[in-house]
């Protein structure tokens, strides 16, 4: 009797897993459509660019197929449709991301939000230091080493960065320490270019060393005032943030 029961349980588990996957797929499609609708309202050039790119690639593929003739013509058409759809989706994703960053620019907690959305093996600790004016320093551990990212008034953030670098250097030894101020002033990194700036830093330590550094710095905790920092941009960009999350999943 055990075997039939196990077989029935296994079948039920598979059916439940399939139902969960289908439900998740439906939810992703609904989120993607919502993201597209929101972006289309924000960006009047989105549809012309997407349609233009799709038609251009399909037309080029058809032209190549007709020129080559034979079986190639029948393979180039579906290939062109797939490639055109892919390029159109890439255009949508890039423009949606640009809109999200534009709306978040200058808002309190925007840098922390951007760091939280980093792709890759980054270890982010938001608000390791802050002031009562909502200036903040966030700590990132990655292959480059330790990176401190400040947001707010540069005059108030620079002393915070110096303090964090000093007390961190005592624990990490020769691991490189970088500091960045997010903003549009001289020597600052715009919010939209923060991820690109981080990924262009040299890889100085291994993933194993990252674990060691993270363990050492965990004991530091956060300085006074860090708790007043919000964990993301102000609520006005909540809907547009879902655009970026959905596009990233796809």
Swiss-Prot record:
Cell location: Cell membrane
One of the record's GO cellular component terms: plasma membrane
Topology versus the membrane: Multi-pass membrane protein
Major location (coarse): membrane
Highest rank taxon of the organism: Bacteria
Keywords per UniProt: Cell membrane, Membrane, Signal, Transmembrane, Transmembrane helix
Signal peptide boundaries: 1-19
Disordered, as annotated region: 226-250
InterPro entries attached to this UniProt entry: DUF4191
TM spans (from-to): 51-71, 73-93
Protein name: Uncharacterized protein MT2276
């Amino acid at each position: 009797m055990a075997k039939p029961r196990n077989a029935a349980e296994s079948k039920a588990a598979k059916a439940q897993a399939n139902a969960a996957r289908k439900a998740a797929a439906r939810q992703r499609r609904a989120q993607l459509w919502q993201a597209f609708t929101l972006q289309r309202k924000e960006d009047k050039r989105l549809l012309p660019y997407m349609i233009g790119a799709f038609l251009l690639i399909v037309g080029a593929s058809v032209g190549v197929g007709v020129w080559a003739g034979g079986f190639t013509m029948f393979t180039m058409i579906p290939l062109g449709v797939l490639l055109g759809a892919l390029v159109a989706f890439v255009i949508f994703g890039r423009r949606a991301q640009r809109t999200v960053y534009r709306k978040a620019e200058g808002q309190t907690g925007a840098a922390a939000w951007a760091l939280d959305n980093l792709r890759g093996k980054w270890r982010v600790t938001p608000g390791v230091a802050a002031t009562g004016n909502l200036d903040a320093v966030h700590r990132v551990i990655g292959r480059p080493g330790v990176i401190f990212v400040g947001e707010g008034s540069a005059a108030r953030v620079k002393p915070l960065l110096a303090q964090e670098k000093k007390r961190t250097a005592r624990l990490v030894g020769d691991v490189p320490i970088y500091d960045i101020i997010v903003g549009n002033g001289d020597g600052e990194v715009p919010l939209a270019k923060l991820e690109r700036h981080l990924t262009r830093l040299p890889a100085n330590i291994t993933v194993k060393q990252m674990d060691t550094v993270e363990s050492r710095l965990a004991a530091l905790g956060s300085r006074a005032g860090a708790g007043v920092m919000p964990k993301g941009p102000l609520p006005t960009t909540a809907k547009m943030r879902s655009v970026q999350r959905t596009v990233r999943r796809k």
